[in-house]
């Protein structure tokens, strides 16, 4: 009888938390610089951090001149704003907008740590539909990145992801409106189905809407992200086992997207912002908008085409897609579409 060989314990690789309170070590960049480098080298985005998309393409198009005044309608982590401020080189002024009261103070501190101050930039806690309230005659360039920031996605307390347990909230500004779980309680089965189709082209819209309604009738309230994920999993039970996991992942992503768009009235807000664009652009002013799903892109495309036909814009171009290299280094860029325009 052969003796059992002693198996050497696998050495800790550093890629997962040794202690629970060290989960997502990347969120502590000062302490875990090597971990962050490993994550980014593999083409992933470190948890709690945001990697700005198509920065080079946007800066090339803007061709920023010293002394210009611009606005970043979706400041977020401040990645685009940082690079714009470097181009302005302590001249002119950059206004930044974000409706998120949790992340905005962090971004202000981040930009100040790079050496910029109130003479260089001003941050406003606003919904970008209200950007015309900023007291300035006009802007030389306007940027909008319509994607959800990684800081929001990677924070389970915000309820933007089905990968971790958290309250089903999904509000960009948690102080405004109602959380997603309340919204679901208010909606009928047909309203949920239409929302999923309209906001995310969800192919399992009927099944998911039916399962959500069934859960409500049975008193199984959908209050957390995992509650909703489990309901979606039940709705897809007839899907082939070979593709079930992948289909569940896609359906959950689309459902969360659709609900986020609904809760934040994103289409209505985008439409209002696009309507105000020409009036706030200086002659020869430039606008660049990054979108991440077909619904957003359709609205931007339609508005730009209309302004071009009306002679308001002298040129439009798009969609411009991120390079293969950028998509490899930052997978969250894969669905990005950039549209640009110049006011005549």
Swiss-Prot record:
This entry's Enzyme Commission designation comes to 2.1.1.199
Gene that produces this protein: rsmH2
* Species the sequence originates in: Acholeplasma laidlawii (strain PG-8A)
Any one GO molecular function term: rRNA (cytosine-N4-)-methyltransferase activity
Q: Which UniProt keywords apply?
A: Cytoplasm, Methyltransferase, rRNA processing, S-adenosyl-L-methionine, Transferase
What the protein does comes down to: Specifically methylates the N4 position of cytidine in position 1402 (C1402) of 16S rRNA.
SUPFAM superfamilies, alphabetized: Putative methyltransferase TM0872, insert domain, S-adenosyl-L-methionine-dependent methyltransferases
Positions in coiled-coil regions? none
Matches recorded under Pfam families: Methyltransf_5
What's in the GO CC field? cytoplasm
Q: Which GO terms describe its biological process?
A: rRNA base methylation
Family membership, please give it. Answer: Belongs to the methyltransferase superfamily. RsmH family.
The name this protein carries in UniProt is: Ribosomal RNA small subunit methyltransferase H 2
Localization in the cell: Cytoplasm
Q: Which reaction does it catalyse?
A: cytidine(1402) in 16S rRNA + S-adenosyl-L-methionine = N(4)-methylcytidine(1402) in 16S rRNA + S-adenosyl-L-homocysteine + H(+)
Task: Report the domain of life of the source organism.
Answer: Bacteria
Q: Which InterPro entries match?
A: RsmH (IPR002903), SAM-dep_MeTrfase_MraW_recog (IPR023397), SAM-dependent_MTases_sf (IPR029063)
The residues the record assigns to binding S-adenosyl-L-methionine are: 78-80, 98, 131, 145, 152
Keyword Repeat annotated: no
The main place the protein resides is cytoplasm
Stored HAMAP family: 16SrRNA_methyltr_H (MF_01007)
Matching PANTHER family: 12S RRNA N4-METHYLCYTIDINE METHYLTRANSFERASE, S-ADENOSYL-METHYLTRANSFERASE MRAW
